[in-house]
């Protein structure tokens, strides 16, 4: 009996080390950033079983077999749609400003279409204004309404939006609503899904959380886009979820969430519509390609129209494009670069681009919330401050709530607004969307918003920062090491 126990023990030990060796080899063979690989290896060697289970669950990008097959199947029809859209030459910009040209050329080469012109944009900073405008647009809708959000939290004005959407469906408007399963868990546990479906709205729970399939699909891959399209002509996107900030996370101790949304009219709605149709097909298997822009209602003749490029990320979309866009924007800056983000855990390349911009004389500012709803990200962000301050970057800590706006402004002319946080999850994993806008007028509007944020912020003093306690430095370095995984 002792011999059997000994044999079993040796086999268990051998299997244990073979498993560690196999996972180690898999990590090394994957094309990933060195810091990310090193962080995973450290976890696996310190906490082997926990590390291996965690890596198999969230260490690699698994969309899931069924969704991956749908993503592959949709691209021939999507590519044909994009090729047909090119026939509408009047909607595409032929020239861009010097600061925006490199980024727009990158997007055109990687996504297959140029930026679209003739759009009218309106920046909106108050959630009440956004929802009231949206309710009016829903009430005036004639054909279709499509929405996708990471979070839909019942309560307050979000319920008024839901009521108006159901009223639209009852009068024959085709309404589709896609919500992330994890982000909108409160919504899916409420009566609202059944009420909406009974009214005729197609409601889809995207990327359902299922612990039984944790090793078949990455559970922390999330649908993080916030988009609304109405009648192939009106569109919204930005950082705001479908929540009333007066009712949302009031016990988090960070204050109300501060967001930014853009309301648009023009062919940009079509460009965003194809992104939505791809998401819808990946999730449901149903194809809903949008119609081409209606030349009879598009404001092409208006010289004040904005030129916009949509940048989409996520499985099935051009790999690393949003990361490349941010790098290109940083390297294109000559006068100033202003960034706002709630979660700042940049890649080494992005950190280097930001610091290099400051070191070559660009006025670089980063606006972050002083209080963060994620302790891990908050500490990890601090680990980058010393290097940023040494390079001459100004760090503003916003004190008026949780600044949730995601924006970049380059030389007052190139603007980036959307859903992308400056962290690994947004840059490499989630379904995200960013708008690149080449327009001085819009840049001035965004600059005014960012100036308002700065007026409600505290500038981080480099000398005081260097005097912070030793325990804070240790905590920052610890979280910094694991930052590639956050």
From Swiss-Prot:
Keywords: Cell inner membrane, Cell membrane, Lipid biosynthesis, Lipid metabolism, Membrane, Phospholipid biosynthesis, Phospholipid metabolism, Repeat, Transferase, Transmembrane, Transmembrane helix. It is a multi-pass membrane protein. The keyword Cell membrane applies. It is found in: Cell inner membrane. It is an enzyme of class 2 (transferase). The chain crosses the membrane at residues 3-23, 38-58. One of its GO terms (molecular function) is cardiolipin synthase activity. Pfam families: PLDc_2, PLDc_N. The active site is at 224, 226, 231, 404, 406, 411. Its EC number is 2.7.8.-. InterPro entries: Cardiolipin_synthase, CL_synthase_A, CLS_N, PLD-like_dom, PLipase_D/transphosphatidylase. It catalyses: 2 a 1,2-diacyl-sn-glycero-3-phospho-(1'-sn-glycerol) = a cardiolipin + glycerol. GO terms for cellular component: plasma membrane. Belongs to the phospholipase D family. Cardiolipin synthase subfamily. ClsA sub-subfamily. This is Cardiolipin synthase A.
């Amino acid at each position: 009996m002792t011999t059997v126990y000994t044999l079993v023990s040796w086999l268990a030990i051998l299997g244990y080390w073979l498993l560690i060796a196999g996972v180690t080899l898999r990590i090394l063979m994957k094309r990933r950033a060195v810091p990310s690989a090193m962080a995973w290896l450290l976890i696996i060697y310190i906490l082997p079983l926990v590390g291996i289970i965690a890596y198999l669950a969230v260490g690699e990008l698994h969309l899931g077999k069924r969704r991956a097959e749908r993503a592959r199947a949709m691209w021939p029809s999507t590519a044909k749609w994009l090729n047909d859209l090119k026939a509408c030459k009047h909607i595409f910009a032929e020239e861009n400003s010097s600061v925006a040209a490199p980024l727009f050329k990158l997007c055109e080469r990687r996504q297959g279409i140029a930026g679209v012109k003739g759009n009218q944009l309106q920046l909106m900073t108050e959630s009440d204004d956004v929802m009231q405008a949206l309710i009016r647009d829903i009430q005036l809708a004639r054909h279709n309404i499509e929405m996708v959000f990471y979070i839909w939290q019942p309560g307050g004005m979000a319920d008024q939006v839901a009521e108006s959407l159901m009223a639209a469906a009852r009068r024959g408007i085709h309404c589709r609503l896609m919500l992330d399963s994890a982000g909108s868990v409160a919504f899916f546990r409420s009566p609202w899904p059944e009420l909406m479906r009974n009214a005729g709205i197609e409601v889809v729970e995207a990327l359902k959380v299922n612990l039984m399939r944790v090793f078949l699909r990455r559970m922390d891959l999330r649908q993080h886009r916030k988009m609304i399209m109405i009648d192939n002509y009106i569109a919204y996107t930005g950082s705001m979820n479908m929540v009333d900030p007066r009712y949302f996370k009031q016990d988090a101790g960070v204050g109300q969430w501060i967001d930014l949304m853009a309301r648009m009219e023009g062919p940009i709605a079509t460009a965003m519509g194809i992104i939505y149709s791809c998401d819808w097909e990946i999730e449901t298997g149903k194809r809903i390609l949008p119609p081409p822009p209606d030349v009879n209602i598009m404001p092409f003749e208006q010289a004040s129209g904005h030129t916009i490029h949509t940048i989409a990320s996520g499985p099935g979309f051009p790999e690393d494009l949003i990361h490349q866009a941010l790098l290109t924007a940083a390297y294109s800056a000559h006068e100033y670069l202003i960034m706002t983000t709630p979660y700042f855990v940049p890649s080494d390349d992005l950190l280097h681009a930001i610091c290099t911009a400051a070191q070559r004389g660009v006025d670089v500012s980063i606006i972050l919330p002083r209080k963060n709803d994620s302790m891990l990200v908050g500490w990890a962000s601090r680990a980058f401050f010393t290097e940023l301050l040494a390079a001459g970057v100004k760090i503003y800590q916003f004190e008026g709530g949780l600044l949730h706006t995601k924006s970049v402004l380059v030389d007052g002319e190139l603007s980036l607004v959307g859903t992308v946080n400056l962290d690994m999850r947004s840059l490499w994993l989630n379904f995200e969307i960013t708008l690149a806008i080449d327009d001085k007028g819009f840049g001035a509007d965004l600059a005014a918003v960012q100036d308002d944020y700065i007026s409600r912020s505290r500038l981080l003093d480099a000398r005081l920062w260097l005097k912070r306690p030793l325990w804070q430095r240790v905590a920052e370095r610890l979280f910094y090491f694991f930052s590639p995984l956050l």
